[in-house]
Design a protein with these regions (language model features):
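Short, Lys/Arg-rich nucleic-acid/phosphate-binding segment
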Residues: 61-67
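C-terminal regulatory/oligomerization modules of transcriptional regulators
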Residues: 1-5, 10, 21-36, 41, ...
Length: 107
């Protein structure tokens, strides 16, 4: 039975978010990724497994090496979900700007 991980649980971990940031620039092997952390390669492999299970990260084989790369389509799914909050906060900041301008004119 295949376990499907939730992408929001996956990005809740700061190490996994850091891994995403690192491989967003270029595909990397687990060893290359592990060099960026003060943790074991096995721990990084566990994080990569979780990111792969929720499809935020994909694998590609190049000879004997496996490279991990960011899956942009899943990041777009996250971005779409976050957009609703961006809109809410932009509206609130616009309202605040209006209030501040009104107060400034009253002085």
């Amino acid at each position: 039975m295949e376990v499907r991980r939730d992408i929001y649980q996956a990005i809740a971990d700061p190490t996994r978010r850091a891994i995403i940031s690192i491989i967003a620039l270029q595909a990397m092997t687990p060893n290359a990724i592990a060099e960026h952390f003060d943790t074991s390669r096995q721990a990084i492999s566990k994080h990569l497994k979780i990111l792969t299970e929720c499809e935020l990260v994909g694998q590609k084989q190049n000879g004997r090496e496996i490279y991990y790369q960011l899956e942009a389509s899943k990041m777009q799914e996250l971005d779409k979900w976050l957009q609703q909050f961006r809109t809410i906060w932009e509206n609130k900041f616009n309202e605040l700007d209006t209030i501040l301008e009104t107060l400034k004119k009253e002085k």
